């Protein structure tokens, strides 16, 4: 059992070293885009299925409430939280539209819409990002594996370099926490007013 635990932790460390090498610049670019989204008065819409839905809710919670520093709340909505809306849309239009219908209702040009998918192939996430792009939003994917079909509909596809779903999920939550830190510092903290 201990050797299994050690192997899991070694795999985690190896992934994070790979992420440091491959994703530092893309995460910084994404943070800049999100900071600009909030600066111009727009909002963040976030979605995913299963564990990715939980990540979307976690991300929205940190943005609306706070991450590390006291600051004004920022507008972010997780599209996986309202069971009445999700089941109404699912019943009337089908599961594939549970997110896209919400994007149609809530998104305005300049918003940022983030789809989280470990496989990169969730049809309902892809459909929502397609709708978001047509609405003039920035489309972002937190993806895994090779980015799947969702990669093609993202202005910024951020792909965790792993084919193992638990590792991808660990990478996603690390990126989410880093983004929360950078957004807060960029708007209210040590990076505010800098040319970063």
UniProtKB/Swiss-Prot annotation:
It catalyses: 2 D-sedoheptulose 7-phosphate = D-glycero-alpha-D-manno-heptose 7-phosphate + D-glycero-beta-D-manno-heptose 7-phosphate. Binds 1 zinc ion per subunit. Disulfide bonds: none annotated. InterPro entries: GmhA/DiaA (IPR035461), Phosphoheptose_Isoase (IPR004515), SIS_dom (IPR001347), SIS_dom_sf (IPR046348), SIS_GmhA/DiaA_subfam (IPR050099). Its cofactor is Zn(2+). Zn(2+) binds at residues 58, 62, 169, 177. It is found in: Cytoplasm. Its EC number is 5.3.1.28. Residues 34-193 form the SIS domain. Its main location: cytoplasm. CDD domains: SIS_GmhA. Pathway: Carbohydrate biosynthesis; D-glycero-D-manno-heptose 7-phosphate biosynthesis; D-glycero-alpha-D-manno-heptose 7-phosphate and D-glycero-beta-D-manno-heptose 7-phosphate from sedoheptulose 7-phosphate: step 1/1. One of its GO terms (biological process) is D-glycero-D-manno-heptose 7-phosphate biosynthetic process. One of its GO terms (cellular component) is cytoplasm. It holds the Pfam family SIS_2. One of its GO terms (molecular function) is carbohydrate derivative binding. Transmembrane segments: none annotated. Substrate binds at residues 49-51, 62, 91-92, 117-119, 122, 169. PROSITE patterns: SIS. Keywords: Carbohydrate metabolism, Cytoplasm, Isomerase, Metal-binding, Zinc. Catalyzes the isomerization of sedoheptulose 7-phosphate in D-glycero-D-manno-heptose 7-phosphate. Belongs to the SIS family. GmhA subfamily. Homotetramer. The reaction produces a racemic mixture of D-glycero-alpha-D-manno-heptose 7-phosphate and D-glycero-beta-D-manno-heptose 7-phosphate. This is Phosphoheptose isomerase. It comes from Trichlorobacter lovleyi (strain ATCC BAA-1151 / DSM 17278 / SZ).
């Amino acid at each position: 059992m201990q050797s299994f635990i050690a192997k899991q932790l070694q795999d985690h460390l190896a992934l994070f070293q790979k992420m440091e090498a491959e994703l530092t610049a893309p995460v910084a670019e994404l943070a800049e885009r999100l900071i600009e989204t909030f600066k111009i008065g727009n909002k963040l819409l976030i979605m995913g299925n299963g564990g990715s839905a939980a990540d979307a809710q976690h991300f929205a919670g940190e943005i609306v409430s706070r991450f590390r520093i006291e600051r004004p709340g920022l507008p972010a909505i997780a599209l996986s939280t309202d069971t009445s809306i999700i089941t109404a849309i699912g019943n009337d239009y089908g599961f594939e539209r549970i997110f896209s219908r919400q994007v149609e209702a809530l998104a305005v040009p300049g918003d940022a819409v983030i789809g989280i998918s470990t496989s990169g192939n969730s049809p309902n996430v892809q459909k929502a990002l397609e709708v978001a792009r047509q609405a003039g939003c920035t489309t972002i994917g937190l993806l895994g594996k090779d980015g799947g079909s969702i990669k093609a509909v993202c202005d910024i596809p951020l792909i965790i370099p792993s084919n193992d779903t638990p590792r991808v999920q660990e990478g996603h939550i690390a990126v989410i926490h880093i983004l929360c830190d950078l957004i807060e510092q960029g708007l209210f903290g040590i990076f505010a007013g800098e040319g970063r």
